[in-house]
Amino acid sequence: NFFEISNKQVLRKKYELNNDAYLVGSFQRDTEGKDLISPKLSKGPDLFINHIDKLINKEKNLEVVLTGKRRNYVINELSKRNIKFHYFEMISFEQLNELYNLLDLYLVTSRYEGGPQAILEAGITKTPIISTDVGIAKQILSEESIIDLDNPLNARPNINYAFSNVQNYLIPKGFDKFNEMFSQIV
């Protein structure tokens, strides 16, 4: 169950994260399972790192928050660059909700995928999010929140727009939108 938690300072203290840090989140796997080195290119971990490389020049106190298994590629790339990160490998849904709520930005950089679920989760928790044009991004996020890969820093989160649109996909109302969306695909 995902929801907004307004007091980020309490959450950051709980997870021992700096209140002055600009926290960017990524909660999906980024590495192929066969060798734990090769990037899972469909998830765009190289695009994530490219965006972080640009963003760190703008946000001097940038730190990355990662969750989930198979985060080897991003962890290795962040380590090479001496970019501070916090890795919470296996967490509960309650903890995941809290981690969304303490972020300054959630970044989806997938090249293709069905969801991603993170767009819905960030929307319902009012987490600032920008995303590549993938899956349901354009159904939930504003045009200004869609990343142009040529100018990635131009993307801007629109929290209220995403929160408003995600309401259409919550149960029970969400079943109608869900069926409508997938009937167009079939």
What does each model-identified segment do?
Residues 119, 128-131:
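Short hydrophobic beta-strand element within catalytic cores of glycosyltransferases
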Residues 3-17:
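A short helix/loop element that forms part of the nucleotide-sugar donor recognition site in Leloir-type
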Residues 111:
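Aromatic "clamp/platform" in nucleotide-sugar-dependent glycosyltransferases that forms part
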Residues 153-186:
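A charged, aromatic-enriched C-terminal amphipathic alpha-helix characteristic of glycosyltransferases
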Residues 68, 73-94:
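Nucleotide-activated donor-binding/catalytic signature segment of Leloir-type glycosyltransferases, i.e.
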Residues 98-103:
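Short alpha-helical donor nucleotide-sugar binding micro-motif in glycosyltransferases
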Residues 17-43, 49-52:
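Conserved donor-binding/catalytic core segment of Leloir-type glycosyltransferases
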Residues 144-153:
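Conserved acidic donor-binding segment of nucleotide-sugar-dependent glycosyltransferases
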